[in-house]
């Protein structure tokens, strides 16, 4: 592979990001590359060993994500941001998401390692059937036939309980003399 951009430069002095940008520019807009293919092309161009690429791979991937000139297109495909207008970037991502919606994915059953073999453990993921019964019954309020106070208002209930303790006939009428209270307030305390 020959990249005209780097003609006359030492390959050992080039960074993987520079080479990745040049490879994608040479391929053109409709030829996005998978990350693994891009890394293989870079390795072939720079002539690096497998161990050297493995060592540089995390740094390259970080640079690829943080460099503003690259854009992830989903499914680990990469392209150059300059290929896409801002509005078109959203459209590309949305069409990729719509394509994925058509394929049904199997749901994985979650396994809790701490619950295995422990019969006394409480599984909080399941709804408690007692809670469901409680909410259904709370909607319908039923009164006890034996206790007529349930149907009365709280004030009536309180009055009837007081009458059981002290019958109404035994209450004494108390006259409140408001003038006396006003006179007491007007007087100043003696020191």
Curated annotation (Swiss-Prot):
Keyword Lyase listed: no
Span list, region Disordered: 118-191
Domain of life: Bacteria
InterPro entries on file: Asxl_HARE-HTH (IPR007759), RNAP_delta_N_dom_sf (IPR038087), RpoE (IPR029757)
HTH HARE-type domain ranges (all copies): 14-83
Leader peptide range in chain numbering: none
Function summary: Participates in both the initiation and recycling phases of transcription. In the presence of the delta subunit, RNAP displays an increased specificity of transcription, a decreased affinity for nucleic acids, and an increased efficiency of RNA synthesis because of enhanced recycling.
Recorded family membership: Belongs to the RpoE family.
Protein name in UniProt: Probable DNA-directed RNA polymerase subunit delta
Lineage: Bacteria, Bacillati, Bacillota, Bacilli, Lactobacillales
Gene (name only): rpoE
């Amino acid at each position: 592979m020959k990249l005209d951009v780097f003609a006359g430069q030492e390959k050992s002095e080039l960074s993987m990001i520079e080479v990745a940008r040049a490879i994608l520019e040479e391929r053109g807009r409709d030829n996005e590359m998978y990350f693994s293919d891009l890394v293989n092309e870079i390795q072939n161009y720079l002539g690096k060993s497998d161990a050297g690429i493995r060592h540089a791979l995390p740094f390259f991937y970080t640079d690829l994500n943080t460099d503003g000139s690259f854009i992830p297109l989903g499914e680990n495909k990469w392209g150059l941001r300059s290929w896409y207008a801002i509005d078109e970037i959203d459209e590309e991502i949305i069409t990729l998401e719509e394509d994925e919606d058509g394929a049904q994915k199997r749901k994985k059953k979650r396994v809790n390692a701490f619950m295995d073999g422990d019969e006394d453990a409480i599984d909080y993921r399941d709804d408690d059937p007692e809670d469901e019964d409680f909410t259904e019954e709370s909607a319908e309020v039923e009164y006890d036939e034996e206790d007529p106070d349930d149907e009365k208002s709280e004030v009536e209930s309180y009055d009837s309980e007081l009458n059981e303790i002290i019958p109404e006939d035994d209450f004494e009428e108390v006259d409140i003399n408001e003038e006396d209270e006003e006179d007491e307030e007007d007087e100043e305390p003696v020191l």
